[in-house]
Amino acid sequence: MAALTNDTAYFHALTRLWDNLVSKKLYITGGMGSRAQGEGFGPNYELQNHTAYCETCAAIANVYWNYRMFLATGDSKYVDVLERALYNGVISGVSLSGDKFFYDNPLESMGEHERQRWFGCACCPGNVTRFMASVPSYAYATQQNDIYVNLYIQGKAEMQTADNKVTLEQTTEYPWNGKVTIKVTPEKEGKFAIRLRIPGWTKAAPVASDLYAYTDAAKKYTLKVNGSATRGAEGDGYETIVRTWKAGDVIELEMPMDVRRIKANDKVEVDRGMVALERGPIMFCLEGKDQPDSIVFNKFIPNDTPIVASYDANLLNGVMVLKGTAKEVEKDGTVKDVAFKAIPYSTWNNRGADQMEVWIPESKEYATPTPEPTIASKAQTFTIQAAIQKDAPESAAVMSYAWGVNDQWEPKRSSDTSKPYFYWWLKNGTVESLAYEFDKPYTVSKVEVYWLDFDHYDGDFRVPQSWTLYYNC
């Protein structure tokens, strides 16, 4: 509407929303929406990893929105966010087999997350399938006699400029390799501009804000036309080559794809002391199946650790993997060297449910040794939830698994929602129950409850007026 009506007030509002998202509420995967409650946002810098919502549909919407913002401005910063969401936050929502889906896309898991074939509210599966068919339309754009090359994807495209019809044919192994060759074939010899997007991942910051930053300096890309080094005018994130093009002209763009470490703004509490690994536009994660002890949370990767990238054609339909030597913290506090392997975040949970993390500790103090099992952690937990509707019969009550109450993650405070927590949704002034079922009789000497204290627009969660413990003996 802002573009069609040339309404600057609307566009200023859009820009303020975009700036707030990208500087304070965007996940490094391009996902957005930290809260399941309301499927929405929390306060600035609330970017929980384990409890992140990051709905698949929201990542798709992030692509749509940023594409429209690009069309209205011609600024590549919007395509940088689009690409980040596309290669990480969107395709993580669908299995490699194409028939299972994530509704939410957390950046950390203890193994409780797994893609499903369908959902009661099945917006994501249909949205993914229609979105995949639209991906080629985001690769190029034209304005008068300018051609914008936004995404580097092998293939051929025909486009109409103001004065010519032009075919561009890309040859590339992107996103695994940063070398791109573009054959230019205009219908007639003529002068026009080809604007090549230089991705944000080749620069000092993943996105156009101080929310995330690389810990190292980027290596410079190289650009050639017909084998000769060239430099075009730089602006809005593009390098623009203006010349008289003829059939058979070839552009070669080579962007070094080193493994880069990313740090979050210190205001993102959950990511302090953590590092994320990226290569090109691809975010990586640790998954339990690739680690010697099948555990990810007890490891840390010091900032001087060498990390090597290699292509594994036999893993997950063929992916780039990162390998190196991490430090593992044992139960007694000792530290030992262990090999680690990281895979693209988008491909996790294609070999069954498992532990996973995107943000990896850099030092011992942020790693979590695997605790010894306790009486509570070995129990089955469940709750009997009455129907939300008033005057519903008792038969409408549902017994379900109670998550987050005995997983041995200790909250920092009652408002800490960074790890799984349990709550009764839309219940206020009611009597609710939660039960532990043990495999055998135990002697229990003490019971404590860490109560949730959490504000949300559709309901606040507070310490109960009273609580009582019942037990069978």
Predicted regions: what is each one?
Residues 1-3, 12, 51-70, 125-135, ...:
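Well-ordered alpha-helical segments within folded domains of soluble proteins
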Residues 2-15, 22, 70-80, 186-188:
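Structural helix-adjacent loops and short alpha-helical linkers that scaffold large soluble proteins
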